[in-house]
Design a protein with these regions (language model features):
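M16 family metallopeptidases and their MPP-like homologs
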Residues: 12-69, 106-128, 153-159, 214-217, ...
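Hydrophobic side chains in well-ordered alpha-helices
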Residues: 63, 144, 167-170, 246, ...
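Scaffold signal of the M16-like zinc-metallopeptidase fold and its non-catalytic homologs
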Residues: 94-151
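Short, polar/flexible loop-turn hinges at active-site or ligand-entry regions and domain interfaces
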Residues: 5-9, 50-54, 73-82
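Acidic/histidine-enriched alpha-helical segments
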Residues: 16, 73-97, 183-193, 291-317
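An aromatic/glycine/proline-enriched structural segment found at the starts
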Residues: 116, 122, 126-132, 147-151, ...
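Active/ligand-binding-proximal structured segments within catalytic/core domains
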Residues: 1-22, 214, 225-238, 248-250
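Structured catalytic cores of enzymes that bind and process phosphorylated ligands/cofactors
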Residues: 34-35, 117, 140-141, 174-177
Length: 317
């Protein structure tokens, strides 16, 4: 919504023209879910002043001013966001929600998350539902924006070379500190304990390749745990690489799936195993995956496997 326009640059064409003038700089919206929190904001990319053809231009200041204009000085009409902009964003969001099913692997993973976490925030899509989007008004969206500005923690990262004091002054002068109140980071609640029963859900679709997603709880294993690094090594051997047990055995040796990988979420103490299968191989693939997990639990891996996994993880950084 904010990318549509601000007071200084009231439409996307004006913003684009300004960015183009600033040596094709770029400002993009950031909207991601991490654990049970939403991270929203903007990122900016621009050329280092030393590489500009004309000396004396200060892109750090110019791009920062535009960024903060977009973020903190939006275009408001009658105490709400401009109706035409809201209508356009709602239409785009509804289309995005409807298009999720086109990516079957991502859709299956999201369905597993919804079923596994239920009404907890982690189980709710960051895009919301079509009904929620349609019901939202320009006024409600603006009030939610103001609440976000007033209460959400703000973190600013800069990657590159700059005058730190200059950047600090820009930030201090543009963040509306007078409107800030009751800012705090949300508490994190990991998914601990065993479920009462194993839940299995099948969504029937006319597809050639089925998607099998398994969600497991990892009680006591999370990003803050002392053995978090050890778990990452475990996952690399189990299903996190092309040399993993899932890939080499379930996919290559048994030919039970087109792909098979494990994806931990250390922020929520959860492990997801995703695979593409022939629908008739569902039970075989599931049992084979669990057999590889049992092999890991039994210590069926070598020192070479550990060394290779560590090297792979280090190279990823």
């Amino acid at each position: 919504m904010l990318s549509r326009g601000c007071k200084a640059y009231p439409d996307m064409a004006a913003i684009s023209e300004r960015l183009e003038y600033l040596y094709a700089s770029d400002i993009s919206a950031v909207y991601v879910k991490r654990a049970e929190s939403l991270i929203v904001g903007f990122s900016a990319d621009f050329v280092k002043d030393a590489f500009l053809p004309e000396k004396g231009e200060n892109l750090l200041n110019s791009v920062s001013v535009l960024l903060f204009d977009i973020l903190f000085d939006p275009l408001i009409e009658n105490g709400a966001f401009r109706e035409s902009y809201v209508a356009g964003e709602k239409a785009d969001l509804i289309n995005a929600i409807g298009a999720k099913i086109n990516n079957k692997a991502a859709y299956a993973k999201e369905r597993c998350t919804e079923i596994m976490f239920g009404a907890r925030p982690y189980g709710i899509s960051e895009l919301g539902t079509v009904e929620e989007v349609r019901a939202a008004t320009s006024k409600q969206i603006y009030e939610r924006y103001k609440q976000l500005v007033e209460t959400a923690p703000i973190e600013i990262f800069f990657n590159g070379e700059c005058n730190a004091e200059e950047l600090s002054e820009i930030v201090k002068s543009r963040i509306p500190t007078s409107a800030r109140r009751n800012t705090s980071f949300p508490t994190r609640a990991f998914l601990d304990g065993e479920p009462d029963e194993v839940t299995e859900v099948t969504d029937e679709m006319p597809v050639a390749q089925g998607k099998l997603v398994m969600g497991l709880r990892m009680s006591g294993v999370n990003v803050n745990a002392p053995d978090a690094a050890a778990f990452n090594v475990f996952n690399e051997i189990f299903g996190g690489s092309a040399n993993s047990k899932l890939f080499m055995n379930v996919r290559e040796a048994m030919s039970l799936c087109y792909y098979c990988r494990s994806m931990p979420d250390m922020f929520m103490s959860a492990l997801f195993i995703s695979s593409g299968i022939e629908p008739e191989n569902r039970e075989k693939a599931k049992n084979a995956i669990l057999e590889q997990l049992d092999a890991m639990k039994a210590g069926d891996f070598s020192d070479d496997d550990i060394a290779e996994a560590k090297l792979s993880l280090c190279n990823a950084y």
